[in-house]
UniProtKB/Swiss-Prot annotation:
Gene3D superfamilies on file: 2.40.30.130, 3.10.310.40, 3.30.54.20, 6.10.250.550, Bira Bifunctional Protein, Domain 2 (3.30.930.10), Threonyl-trna Synthetase, Chain A, domain 2 (3.30.980.10)
Record's signal peptide: none
Stated name of the protein: Alanine--tRNA ligase
Cofactor annotation comment: Binds 1 zinc ion per subunit.
Binding site for Zn(2+): H575, H579, C677, H681
InterPro entries per UniProt: aa-tRNA-synth_II/BPL/LPL, Ala-tRNA-lgiase_IIc, Ala-tRNA-ligase_IIc_anticod-bd, Ala-tRNA-synth_IIc_core, Ala-tRNA-synth_IIc_N, Ala-tRNA_ligase, Ala_tRNA_ligase_euk/bac, DHHA1_dom
Length: 887
């Protein structure tokens, strides 16, 4: 057996299957594209569904024996978080891992799959395992696989184990038996003859599964029966981390070259050693695992947030930070490990090193935010725990746990952990109810499902070609080839009716890539229809949503299709300006900026992009200036088609989530911008005229948004802004040029008046305090003052309370003011009475509760608020009762 690095194992696997006629499918992004069923890519086959279900035929004619039934292999990065609590506590559980796999869509089957697996594992040219250390499992009814292993490979019967569990089935759809290959690590990992699990396929550390070969040969029907598939498929998976643990002769995956450098770097930060304390080792493993997952996920475009995959990232980071405390790390540090991950993985994933600065910045920001959250959330949680205990409960209400999560970003797992330390539990069912209510609110806020999706079944049957000519022509002669109304195919629609139509030739752009659809009309002597929207149908045709204004629209009839030219011209100006803006953002803010969404409409453009931190006003000015400079340079806009890899090599920006074929459309704006784009553009930047940013804001963690206008809309916007400026200057009796100086003068005057007002208020408060000293009562030998006073804000109340403490020397004081339907309360206790057990925080909390509020604070000074001014007298009356209860 060879001792190989992880990079060598990965490379060797792909080279082996290339020799067997397989095309190497590049590792796809962890974020699924066009697969809403998955939060993350979680297996090697997950990215190949499009091939297995026949939606796409892989292009591999050069090396495939049967071109339409190709052979594929890959090394696919994956994330699974369903066993997150086991990560760090077992030898082989991970959130991020790599699957090496070979696949066949209707080409070879069991014989080749088994023979090639055996060759790769045992040949001295490849892995070189001792065949005596290998065992396999098969399904009891899979005689074909059994006979191949027994009669062709030559495995002895005792090393072929029949297991009922060797059947891959996820419900309706393809399914079939599988065979798993196990490596015997030796007696050091298990030698108890009485252990019922000590066999290949059992729960033990001795026999390690290294490869799973799935033979997809049946279809699981809705009625529960199984029928043979017309084309049989192969789907295999080998975990890289597990294979490396064997080849590098280490006890767990965490000692391989995929993890150990991260652990060593963490040792330097922590000042602790891995391998000396099992509990601390868990922390090292959690950190090493989670930083891999977070680094790759952010590199692929995910960002921490409170929902979906963003919440998974946030949870992983926060779990690692929590475990870091066990090894003495109490500061942001995870970001320092990003370059280590990049160095380990650069052989196959060079993009991690390229994006390391951005990834580290995102992680550091999230870590810093969590340390703040931890401090604030723990204070709130302490109050919640105290309140529950006062009520005699050992359960934190689900509503409170959800408030901590929703308002303060405090993870439910963290709440449960701290609750357990306090001897309490969390009402998890109540938390889930609140979470579901929030989801329902979100669902209700969403727009209805797109009609094309609803009618996908009907549209999916329409195979006729629809040719788009709208790049060059805004008017075309079109024949209607299909009409869909209320989810059914019809022959015609009449005046006043709405429908969707597909035509053979169309100049109307279908909404995609952020550019909204064209509008316009279909017209002929027999009828006119207004085009309201255009979307892509499942088979790629342009689907026009129309309302018939006059006459009828019939299938097979010919119409003149006419795009609204004025709207299209405004759209193309905004689209080309969006490309200029994208490049300008990279130039000013950094190469980490990536498009996160866009809208190109006739009246404006909206551009969402990844960037942590605020965009400074001077940066925004520079971005706007750069875009206008490119417009005024009159740069030509050239559009051409290139092979995808050649376009990327030229530096063309490919946008995440967009699907590209082998040949792509490249939009080149002078020498300034180069992007892959299927949208419509101006022929020259001078046609845009003017670019003006209207707003810039944050729309989520690490995501910013710019809205802008161009051309006539930019001119109108600037004219409106100038009119507002002139009106403001007129009201202040100055000119627009002198407006700033005039405002500076007014602010200085206002500040002086505020100082005078504060001085006057302080004198009045002093006078009122003098008057209040006459209202002090003796309660069991304790001077008590509880009074309603006039005060503008809490600062005045506090100043009054401090003054009274000075004047009285010893006293319990509660002051209340009521304004605008709200109550403000302050409680003060002199130091001598604090020593006797009087507590301002507890007192003000009781008083506030009697006028519909709450609060608290220190023993000597505390404040609170209330919602019912009518109860102030009653609340103040309680002060004497409280003092009696303490004294």
């Amino acid at each position: 057996m060879k001792k190989l690095t992880s990079a060598q194992v990965r490379r060797m696997f792909l080279e082996f299957f290339q020799e067997k006629g397989h095309a190497v499918e590049p590792s796809a992004s962890l974020i699924p594209v066009d697969d809403p069923s998955l939060l993350w890519i979680n297996s090697g086959v997950a990215t190949l569904k499009k091939y297995f279900d026949g939606r796409i035929v892989p292009e591999n004619p050069r090396i495939c024996i049967v071109p339409e039934n190709p052979r594929i292999c890959n090394a696919q990065k994956s994330i699974r978080t369903n066993d997150i609590e086991n990560v760090g506590k077992t030898a082989r559980h991970h959130t991020f891992f790599e699957m090496l796999g070979n696949f066949s869509i209707g080409d070879y089957f069991k014989r080749e799959a088994i023979h090639w697996a055996w060759e790769f594992l045992t040949s001295d040219k490849w892995i070189g395992f001792d065949p005596e250390r290998l065992s396999v499992t098969v399904h009891p009814e899979d005689e074909e696989a059994y006979n191949i292993w027994r009669n062709e490979i030559g495995l002895p019967e005792e090393r072929i184990i029949r297991l009922e569990g060797n059947f891959w089935d996820i419900g309706e759809g393809p399914s079939g038996p599988n065979t798993e290959i196990f490596y015997d690590r030796g007696e050091a990992f298990g030698n108890d003859p009485n252990d019922p699990e000590l066999y290949p396929g059992g729960e033990n550390d001795r026999y390690l599964e290294v490869w799973n070969l799935v033979f997809s040969q049946f279809n699981h029907n809705p009625d529960g029966t199984y029928t043979p598939l017309p084309k049989k498929n192969i789907d295999t998976g080998m975990g890289l981390e597990r294979m490396c643990s064997i080849l590098q002769d280490v006890p767990t995956n965490f000692e391989t070259d995929l993890f150990l450098p991260i652990i060593r770097a963490t040792e330097q930060i922590a000042g602790e050693r891995y391998g000396e304390d099992p509990d601390k080792d868990v922390a090292f493993k959690v950190i090493a695992d989670h930083i891999r997952a977070v680094t790759f996920a952010i590199g692929d475009g995910a960002l921490p947030s409170n929902e979906g995959r963003g919440y998974v990232l946030r949870r992983l980071l926060r779990r690692a930070v929590r475990y870091a405390k066990h090894i003495g790390i109490d500061r942001p540090f995870m970001y320092e490990l990003v370059p280590v991950v990049g160095e380990i993985m650069h052989d196959y994933y060079p993009e991690v090193k390229e994006k390391a600065d951005f990834i580290a910045r995102v992680i550091r920001t999230e870590e810093e935010r969590f340390h703040e959250t931890l401090h604030e959330g723990l204070a709130i949680l302490a109050e919640v725990i105290e309140k529950a205990k006062e009520q005699g409960s050992d359960v934190i209400p689900g509503e409170e746990a959800f408030r901590l999560y929703d308002t303060y970003g405090f993870p439910i797992e963290l709440t449960e952990e701290y609750a357990a330390e306090a001897g309490m539990t969390v009402d998890h069912a109540g938390f889930e109810r609140e979470m579901e209510r929030q989801r329902e609110r979100a669902r209700a806020a969403r727009q209805d499902v797109d009609s094309m999706q609803v009618q996908g079944g009907v549209l999916g049957d329409i195979k006729d070609e629809s040719r788009f000519v709208g790049y060059d022509e805004l008017v075309a002669a079109s024949t209607v080839i299909a009409i869909v109304k209320d989810g059914r195919l019809v022959e015609e629609v009449k005046a006043g009716e709405e429908a969707q139509i597909i035509v053979d030739v169309t100049p109307f752009y279908a909404e995609s890539g952020g550019q909204i659809a064209d509008q316009g009309v279909f017209e002929s002597e027999t009828g006119t229809a207004v085009v309201k929207d255009v979307q892509k149908a499942p088979n790629g045709q342009h689907l026009h949503a129309i309302i018939v204004e006059r006459g009828t629209v019939k299938k097979g009839s010919r119409y003149t299709a006419r795009v609204d030219e004025a709207k299209r011209m405004r759209i193309v100006k905004n689209h080309t300006a969006t490309h200029l803006l994208h490049q300008a953002l990279k130039d000013v803010l950094g190469r980490h900026v990536n498009q996160a969404g866009s809208l190109v409409a006739p009246d404006r453009l909206r551009f969402d992009f990844t960037h942590f931190g605020q965009v400074k006003p001077e940066e925004l000015e520079r971005i706007e200036a750069i875009v206008n400079e490119q417009i005024w340079k009159s740069l030509p806009v050239d559009i051409f088609y290139k092979p995808l890899e050649e376009a990327k090599a030229m530096g063309a920006m490919a946008l995440f989530g967009e699907k590209y074929g082998d040949i792509v459309r490249v939009v080149k704006v002078g020498d300034y911008s180069l992007e892959l784009c299927g949208g419509c553009h101006v022929p020259n930047t001078s046609a845009i005229g003017l670019f003006k940013i209207v707003s810039e804001s944050g729309i989520g963690a690490g995501t910013r948004r710019i809205e802008a206008v161009t051309g006539e809309a930019a001119y109108r916007f600037m004219s409106e802004q100038l009119a507002i400026l002139q009106e403001a200057a007129q009201k202040l009796k100055t000119s627009p040029k002198e407006l700033n100086a005039r405002l500076d003068g007014l602010f200085a005057e206002l500040k002086e008046l505020e100082r005078e007002n504060e001085s006057l208020a302080a004198r009045l408060a002093h006078m009122e305090a003098e008057h209040l000293t006459r209202q002090v009562k003796d309660v069991n030998g304790v001077p008590v003052l509880a009074a309603k006073v006039q005060a503008n804000d809490m600062n005045q109340l506090r100043a009054m309370a401090d003054d009274l403490k000075q004047k009285l020397g010893t006293a319990v004081i509660v002051l209340a003011s009521a304004q605008g339907g709200k109550v403000q309360l302050i409680a003060a206790v002199t130091d001598d009475l604090v020593k006797k057990g009087f507590h301002a925080g507890k007192l003000v909390k009781e008083v506030a509760s009697r006028c519909g509020g709450g609060g608290g604070g220190r023993p000597d000074l505390a404040q609170a608020g209330g919602k019912d001014p009518s109860k102030v007298g009653e609340a103040l009356g309680y002060v004497e009762t409280w003092v009696k209860s303490v004294s």
